[in-house]
Amino acid sequence: MLKRDQVSEYLKKLEQNERKILRDLGVKFGRYHVFLYQLIKPEAVSLRTLLWKNFYQKFHNLKPPTFGLNFLDDKEIKNKNFMLLCGFERFDNFFVRIDILERLFVLIINSSSKENSEIKLVPEMLNLLGCSKDNFKKLLQKMNYKIFEKENET
């Protein structure tokens, strides 16, 4: 898993046929990350975290989040590199699974109106993350979106 902004120069130089080859191999070019979806699966995460702990010879008390969770609100997690290794992106105390974050971005794009840049909060967004409406609003703010109430809507 790579943060897209860390490899943006490399990605700009990739030809479309090279991108197609990578896509055919399972590489996902998301808004925020470039990743292999197969590496977010539980078995791959377990193996990667085991190897990571053995390589660094510390952090043995760190455990990956429960598989199946898409959203975490945890102020105790300090090691963002470990969480990224587990497939989660950090937004202060919120963690969102990378593939879910990309799907959320698609929902946001699809819910925005053409005449302005407003997005409407739809239940599918909350269901995708599995978080409360309040936490979702806070997450959007941490992702640099502006939140405002509009006649009982968000």
PLM segments and residue spans:
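Acidic, serine/threonine- and proline-rich low-complexity intrinsically disordered segments
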Residues: M1-L121, L128-K133, K138, M143-N152
